[in-house]
Regions:
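C-lobe/activation-segment region of protein kinase-like
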Residues: 2-3, 197-198, 210-217, 228-287
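A glycine-rich phosphate-binding loop feature that marks nucleotide/adenosyl-phosphate handling sites
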Residues: 170, 224, 278-280
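Conserved kinase catalytic-core helix
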Residues: 135-161, 167-168, 184-218, 223, ...
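Residue-level detector of family-conserved "landmark" positions at structurally sensitive sites
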Residues: 84, 164, 219-220, 273
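Conserved ATP-binding subdomain of kinase catalytic cores across diverse folds
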Residues: 50, 57-183
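Juxta-kinase regulatory segment immediately upstream of eukaryotic protein kinase catalytic domains
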Residues: 7-84
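Short, glycine/acidic-enriched loop or turn micro-motifs at the edges of active sites
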Residues: 110, 178, 222, 227, ...
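Short acidic, glycine/proline-rich loop/turn micro-motifs
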Residues: 120, 184-189, 244-246
């Protein structure tokens, strides 16, 4: 989470643009819907205890389509409140949320972000999503369903990934990985006492993804691994493709290369060719 001093006070013009952008909220057909869920969004409107949250987060993430999707999830009782952001990226913000059964992670994908145009290479060639529309909003919804299915497949393979619970338009609801205080830290942000052991475990995870799940993560790095109670969890599986994808091996080589580079930075000797061979057809770890 970025420090509070990275955020500047918005100028009056930007506030006026923000107001105009959300004028639709005052329309009668939407006002009742927004009134129903406004209390559940206090934490992401800068009115909760997390002071670094400001109106720009709301503007960037909570457009009409997203609010309608959240309203539907709240009507069904799947979500009670959206509490505060826990991660953000080019494609999505992730929020801690609360349900009747405890904390959740809610990943909201940006519906107006042009970066998705560069992600079609992870969809084109995936037989699970052939023949579907490539218009931007549909592309975002495809991406959400893709991450949902990839996480399901990885869990069936015995891997520790957040359990995907449901998706609605551009909103993905998942198991929250962390404790009552905070999400679990990324591998990037912790002190690794046994780099060789962690490397071997991650290589085994990568082998299970390839051999058992018939997938390539395609963005496997220290940024997308969480550490919880000494166990490693894989996250951000939206870009994962099947092993039948025409670029699957290219993505796998990239993943293995990143992992070996991480190991070397930590002082452990690792070679790409040997590591790649072990992922492709080496023995699998006991999970």
């Amino acid at each position: 989470m970025p420090p509070e001093d990275e955020w500047e006070e918005p100028d009056p013009d930007s506030l006026m643009r923000s107001e105009r952008k959300h004028e639709w909220i005052s329309e009668p057909r939407y006002k009742r819907m927004f009134d129903d869920i406004e209390h559940a969004l206090q934490g992401v409107m800068g009115k909760g205890p997390f002071e670094w949250v400001d109106r720009r987060v709301f503007d960037q993430v909570f457009d009409r389509s997203t609010l309608l999707a959240l309203h539907k999830l709240m009507e069904k009782g799947e979500i009670e409140t959206i509490d505060h952001p826990i991660a953000r990226g080019k494609e999505a913000h992730v929020f801690r949320a609360t349900s009747a059964n405890g904390p959740l992670a809610v990943k909201i994908f940006h519906t107006t972000n042009a970066v998705f145009k560069g992600l079609t290479k992870y969809i084109d060639g995936d037989p699970r999503f052939s023949g579907l529309s490539r218009r931007h909003r549909e592309l975002v919804n495809i991406w959400v369903r893709k991450e949902f299915r990839n996480l399901k497949r990885m869990r069936r393979g015995g891997l520790r990934v957040p359990e995907p619970l449901l998706n609605q338009k551009n909103v993905l609801v998942m198991e929250f990985v962390g404790d009552e205080e905070a999400p679990s830290p990324r591998l990037k942000d912790i002190e690794v006492e046994d780099p060789a052991g962690v490397f071997e475990e991650l290589l085994g995870i990568m082998a299970v993804i390839w051999q058992t799940c018939d997938l390539v993560h395609a963005d496997f790095s220290e940024y997308n691994i969480l550490s919880k109670d000494g166990e490693l969890w894989v996250i951000d599986a939206g870009q994962a493709v099947t092993t039948r994808h025409p670029s699957a091996r290219e993505f796998l080589v990239r993943d293995v290369t990143r992992l070996t580079e991480w190991a070397r930075r930590k002082g452990h000797s690792a070679e790409v060719a040997d590591s790649l061979g072990r992922v492709l057809d080496g023995p699998l770890p006991e999970l």
